[in-house]
Regions:
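Short active-site neighborhood of thiol/selenol oxidoreductases, capturing the structured segment around
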Residues: 62-86, 90
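Generic structural signal for well-ordered beta-strand positions
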Residues: 60-61, 181
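N-terminal targeting signals for export/organelle localization
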Residues: 1-49, 53, 203
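Thiol/disulfide oxidoreductase modules built on the thioredoxin-like
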Residues: 140-196
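Extracytoplasmic/luminal low-complexity segments enriched in Pro/Gly and acidic/polar residues
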Residues: 197-203
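Short loop/turn microsegments at loop-to-beta-strand junctions
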Residues: 47-48, 70, 168-170
């Protein structure tokens, strides 16, 4: 579960690259801001090219999803609460959008490749058939996470060798050309997420 210190680090990082909450939008964006009060509009460099492996070992690159909106989520399969809740919200939003959801590619990037790689395919398939789970070496994952300004760190558990991962559980939204559109905070409801996605699908 994301800790308060983690959220503070995330917000500081995003602020430093020019992320702004839509509090006082220009007049022509007022309607959008009212609909998307959970969405942070990006002005800095967040995201970028990546190549990781899917559960079959096939290399997948962000460039193959051009023409679709891309939802990017960093998490891990052992996450007890935040990840399942956010992935379920995404799943419900995709279901609500119906056929239009074909123009959205949801991607789950594990921040725990040591434990997740073997179970990643089954895990994401339990939420929505269009989800693609991606993994890689710890170094590859760290590089992509850094590009998205996503924080994560191992937290020792009770038993020997046990651990959880403290991570930023936000939902990143990327445009049809791969540009960063913004992110939704943890536990954004499916209704709000549907509204946001529907607006961008119409563009």
């Amino acid at each position: 579960m994301i800790a308060s210190r983690t959220l503070a680090l995330l917000l500081m990082s995003l602020f430093n690259v020019g992320i702004a909450i839509a509090e006082d939008p220009p007049p022509d964006q007022i309607a959008a801001a009212q609909m998307m009060d959970d969405l942070m509009h990006g002005r800095g460099t967040v995201g970028g090219p990546f190549t990781l492996a899917d559960p079959t070992g096939r290399k997948r690159s962000d460039s193959e999803f051009r023409g679709k909106l891309m939802i990017v989520y960093f998490g891990y399969t052992f996450c007890p609460d935040v990840c399942p809740a956010d992935l379920m919200a995404i799943t419900q939003a995709l279901a609500e959008l119906g056929p239009a959801a074909r123009d959205i590619q949801p991607i789950f990037i594990t921040v725990d490749p040591e434990r997740d790689t073997k179970v990643l395919g089954e895990y994401v398939a339990a939420f929505h058939k269009s989800f693609i789970g991606l993994t890689g070496t710890p170094e590859e994952i760290r590089k992509v996470a850094n590009a998205y300004k996503a924080f994560y760190a191992k937290v020792p558990g009770v038993g020997k060798g046990e651990y959880e991962i403290d991570h930023t559980g936000v939902i990143y939204l990327m445009g049809r050309d791969g540009e960063y559109l913004g992110f939704m905070p943890p536990q954004t409801g499916p209704e709000r997420l549907t509204e946001i996605l529907r607006q961008y699908l119409a563009k």
